[in-house]
């Protein structure tokens, strides 16, 4: 890390620790507006500096702060306390590693593996995860597959590309609308949902076991659609034994979260159990398939639109389509996040609404986002 980067990191860590301590000492009800704004700035700065672990922690903490300030019934004091504490612990540990010039520990805490350049890459999108906090942000994780080998990427390799959009409180716009806004590389993320081969040039990847390979774009990167893709079925497979082996070998640390160990799964034949409501802002839908028992969590807020309604409809069908999604392990349960229904004509993306987007609202978002 260069000296200028080290100074920026130290400044961010000190600012973050101070904001968390002020927030905990004053409490949310009496915390100053500037303290809450400092938390938001810290999240954006951590994302800009590609501090994956710290950025994701701050994102969730800010999500709970936003829920509290808006009076949302989904607010969880337990989640807020956990992620504020985790953010402080990460910031303190990283500052200690910087002071001790311990690059190995710092790299592990930053969770930023080295990148590898890729000149050209062809992918298709199997699904997309969506997380929305009104008045704060909308985040999308596109689950991709490489359609052919392109060193160092292997054919069929699982990949992720993520994008996060700030959301203003006064903007009445569905989260999907932001996918139609051009990125600084001049492409619109919505092209990934066209069920076509997408060609990405002058990009990079980084690998960090056991996560999927992450696609990284730079200022010179380009993304454009190519040919139609209809060879979906060979991509619809997973190996439970390999997943079990990865789980057996996994050694979590106190800083790891359950969702950091995820598996992409395909559930061919499945049945739904009795739906149950929780006070955590989501409903539980038991799903049995492939000799395994899953627990699907359906968000009752904007993150679950339109997934909640679609899964309710699919659960009532006699002939149910195969499902694709991601699973993490929590309290000895397989927690499923359904992303896609698999049909004869390819994937049906369950998490993004097909409704038309107001062009006038889009123009307004482009001016102020």
Identify the function of each model-found stretch.
Residues 1-369:
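Helix-loop junction hotspots and adjacent acidic micro-motifs that serve as functional foci
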């Amino acid at each position: 890390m260069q000296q200028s980067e080290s100074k920026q990191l130290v400044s961010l860590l000190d600012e973050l620790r101070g904001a968390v301590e002020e927030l905990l000492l004053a409490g949310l009800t009496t915390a100053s507006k500037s303290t809450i704004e400092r938390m938001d700035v810290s999240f954006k700065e951590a994302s800009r500096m590609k501090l994956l672990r710290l950025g994701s922690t701050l994102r969730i903490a800010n999500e709970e702060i936003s829920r509290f300030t808006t009076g949302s019934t989904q607010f969880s004091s337990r989640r807020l306390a956990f992620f504020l504490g985790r953010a402080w612990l990460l910031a303190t540990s990283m500052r200690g590693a910087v002071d001790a010039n311990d690059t190995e520990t710092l790299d592990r805490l930053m969770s930023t593996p080295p990148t590898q350049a890729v000149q050209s890459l062809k992918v298709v999108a199997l699904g997309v995860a969506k997380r929305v906090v009104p008045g704060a942000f909308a985040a999308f994780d596109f689950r991709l597959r490489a359609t052919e080998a392109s060193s160092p990427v292997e054919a069929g390799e699982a990949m992720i590309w993520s994008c996060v959009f700030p959301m203003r409180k006064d903007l009445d716009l569905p989260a999907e609308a932001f996918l139609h806004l051009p990125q600084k590389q001049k492409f619109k993320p919505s092209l990934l949902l066209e069920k076509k081969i997408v060609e990405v040039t002058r990009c990079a990847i980084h690998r960090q076991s056991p996560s999927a390979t992450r696609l990284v774009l730079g200022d010179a990167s380009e993304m454009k659609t190519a040919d139609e893709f209809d060879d979906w079925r060979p991509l619809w497979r997973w190996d439970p034994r390999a997943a079990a082996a990865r789980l057996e070998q996994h050694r979590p640390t106190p800083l790891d979260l359950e969702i950091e160990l995820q598996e992409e799964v395909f559930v061919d034949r499945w049945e739904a159990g009795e739906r149950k409501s929780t006070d955590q802002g989501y409903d539980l839908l038991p799903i049995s398939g492939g000799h395994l028992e899953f627990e699907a969590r359906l968000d009752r807020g904007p993150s679950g639109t339109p997934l909640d309604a679609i899964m309710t409809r699919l659960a009532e069908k006699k002939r149910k389509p195969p499902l694709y999604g991601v699973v993490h392990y929590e309290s000895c349960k397989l927690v499923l996040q359904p992303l896609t229904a698999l049909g004869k004509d390819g994937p049906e993306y369950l998490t993004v609404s097909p409704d038309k987007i107001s062009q006038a609202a889009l123009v307004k978002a482009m001016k102020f986002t």
